[in-house]
């Protein structure tokens, strides 16, 4: 009985920690995008790609505001990949 209670408690605490990490990743990715776009003149991303990145950033902020952490992480990761791939060219 005690073992079962401890396992349930551990599972609940683990889920809470994972949710916090996801929220942190969402915020961290948004901050990276803000930083990169602030110095956009120093990057090789221009035109339509910048527009796409800004649209993904806006979507991520909406997802974050509505509590959709997974959507936020997906959008910010896509935007960061666009910026990273543009830097390789």
Curated annotation (Swiss-Prot):
GO terms for cellular component: extracellular region. The keyword Signal applies. Residues 1-19 form the signal peptide. Keywords: Secreted, Signal. It is found in: Secreted. Its main location: secreted. This is Uncharacterized protein PA14_33160.
